[in-house]
Every structure is written in structure tokens, then in C-alpha cells.
Amino acid sequence: MTDAQGKPRIDQTGWLVAHSLAKSFGKRVVVRDVSIAVRRGEAVGLLGPNGAGKTTVFTMIMGLVKPDAGSISLDGREITRLPLFQRGQLGIGYLPQEPSIFRGLSVRGNIMAVLENHVKGKAERHARLEALLDEFSIRHLAKANALALSGGERRRVEIARALASHPHFMLLDEPLAGIDPIAVGDIRDLVAHLKDRGIGVLITDHNVRDTLKIVDRAYILHEGRVLMEGAPDEIVADAEVRRVYLGERFSL
């Protein structure tokens, strides 16, 4: 999956690839020649200390920030200049950290709002709706208003709604922020479920320990560059990663 310079190739299907991304804000260089790749059916972490550039890389992949240099491709198609909504139409889903449920709609209405933009046939829309209600055990909530949901119920509805567009990749922004251990387990189960569906998952989060327990591999950014890429145990064992990010006492 890499070229002669060790960077991800951009001509392969089944991959979401960022190649040699760079970004500056004024005179401050935030991202320097960052290349990452996510394959369908795997979970990848995008981690690093504050100011490492991970949030900027994440938002460039989403389509919210335009890179100064480099490219982004999906299934071999360059999407670098496409906005967020067009990337969504091509198969990139996004689950923000903040609540994103449509508060004035029922659970059924939340999911159907997405299906109506992605599925043409009425019968197929309703079949997909019923399948998602069952898949996420929210059928009993179908008529409930979004405002009446608990935090866990709301999250399940948001995930079901995100999957209504049939994404090939899901970008999870800080999914572990401020949640209790039970909810961490729910996120772990969610990521496993997405992988079983053949969906590639990219996670950025400040909770490095729990993220490394969830992902198959991760990229560690430092001062705007990729410091290391590898499996969680390889990252934890790396002396330089420990020095600048994890600390000597870190363990999984």
C-alpha cells in the first residue's frame, strides 16, 4: 500500500488515503507532509499531543479545511477539492463529538431524513429504516421525540442515521470524550460492528489509552508530522513516542 518513498498510494479501491498533506495558518505551519491511509474493514487512530496537527488533518479529510498541498482520495478517486456533503455522497460518513440529532423529529424521522436523500425508492427506504431500527435495538423508540432520549439512546440513533447513507468509511471525532467506562465499551462494540460491516473507521481522540485498545493501528503525529505508524503494541513500545507523547509509565 506504499510507494517507493513509503507513502500511501492513491490509486487503489477500498482505501481512503491522504497523501503529503500540508497546511499553514498565517505564518504558523500546522501540518507538514502528512500521509495516512485507512482500509475498509479496519479501525485506525489519528493521535498525538496537543498542537500536533491531528485535528487539522482530520478536518482536511472531512472536507472542512482545504489543504495547502497534497491530495485526498477515496477508492482511487481524488476528492481533495470536494466539500463535506459531496464526500458524504461518495461514502464518507462523519459522527461529530457534539450531539447532532435532529431535535424536532422522532427517531424514525431522524433516520428517514437521511434515507430520503440517499435512497430513491419508497419501498427500499422503508425497508432500510426497519432494518436499522432492528440493528441498533431502537424499534421501541421509533415514535419517540429526539428530545426524550437518553444519552446512550441518542448516540445509537445518530449512528443508525449515519449508516443510513451506506458509508464506506466513518470518521469519529472524539467519541470517547467525557464518557464513563460502560460507554467506552459501547464505543468499542460500535467500532467492531462497523468493521464487521466492512466500513473503515478513522478515530481522533485525546483518550489515547482507550483508543489504542479499539483500533487496529494508529498514526502518531508530532509537530505536524507523522512520528510513527503501527499496531498499538508497536506504538507503546516505541521509545520516541514515549518520550514526546505517552510518557515512560504508560501501559495499555
Q: Which sequence ranges carry the predicted segments?
A:
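The feature captures the beta-strand-to-loop junction immediately N-terminal to the Walker
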Residues: 47-49
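Conserved ABC ATPase "signature" region
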Residues: 112, 123-141, 189-192
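Helix-to-loop junction immediately C-terminal to a conserved catalytic motif
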Residues: 62
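Conserved ABC ATPase signature
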Residues: 145-149, 153
